[in-house]
A protein has these predicted regions:
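Hydrophobic transmembrane alpha-helices and immediately adjacent juxtamembrane helices
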Residues: 1-255
């Protein structure tokens, strides 16, 4: 895959540029929307949920931002990745290029948006009197795994979308449910231990919790937590690669 990516480096770079420009085409603020969108969502969540869930929670704004930051990246990457094949059918039906390039270009564009939002997140942490420690370097672990997890889910969803167009509506409903099951605006500590363990089945919650442990609690999660995140990522990437390899030759007949 790396050799193929290097061989088509120019095409890949052009796809990333095209996707980024296309997203903000005919907008006045352009890429600034990458910063305003999560900030607006954060503001709404803070106004709505503070009185219900954050009244006695320290650094609740940062707590919300951690959840919103991770979930927004996951949601955007998977939603964009799902349509990556269908949206570029006019290219790969005429030119023989690796189809995963389109998915990777979407993920790189989403990663750029995530990086911009992450800069704003750091500023919010400063305003919220968050203590910066050496543990922040450990955030590279969940970010790296989340990128891979998004790619794996994108491979699965893009393959399914070629054959089943209804998947876009089902995924939209699923992500809405997932948002409420990822403890973005509430704490799982209020639930019984057995219920708290159920949240560990949600990979997105694991990434969110890792961020909060480092940023707010200033602790590094235990080794088993790292292993669980890695396992979820490997499963997603493994299934995604399997589906891509199995159905790759059939995509041309359904787009």
């Amino acid at each position: 895959m790396l050799t193929s990516l290097q061989r088509h480096q120019f095409l890949f770079e052009e796809l990333v540029k095209r996707d980024f420009k296309k997203k903000y085409k005919r907008t006045v603020l352009g890429a600034v929307w990458s910063l305003l969108s999560p900030l607006m969502m954060l503001l709404v969540m803070r106004l709505v949920f503070t009185q219900f869930f954050g009244r006695h929670m320290l650094h609740y704004t940062t707590y919300l931002f951690c959840g919103n930051l991770v979930f927004a990246f996951f949601n955007e990457s998977t939603s964009q990745g799902m349509s990556s094949l269908m949206g570029n059918a006019s290219i790969f039906t005429k030119v023989n290029v690796p189809k995963y390039l389109f998915l990777l270009s979407k993920n790189v564009q989403c990663l750029i948006n995530f990086a911009l939002t992450l800069c704003v997140f750091v500023l919010f942490c400063i305003l919220d009197d968050i203590t910066f420690t050496w543990r922040w370097i450990m955030l590279l672990y969940p970010i790296g795994l989340l990128v891979c997890f998004n790619i794996g889910m994108g491979l699965i969803l893009s393959a399914l979308f070629v054959f089943f167009r209804d998947i876009q509506y089902l995924w939209s409903i699923f992500t809405q449910l997932l948002m409420y099951m990822s403890a973005i605006f509430y704490s799982v500590e209020t639930y019984a231990p057995d219920v708290q363990n159920l949240f560990l089945l949600n990979p997105v919650y694991l990434f969110i919790r890792y961020f909060r442990e480092i940023v707010i609690n200033m602790t590094v999660p235990p080794l088993w937590f790292h292993a669980l995140m890695l396992a979820d990522t490997l499963i997603a990437v493994g299934i995604g690669c399997f589906m891509y390899k199995k159905y790759n030759h059939r995509f041309l007949y359904y787009v």
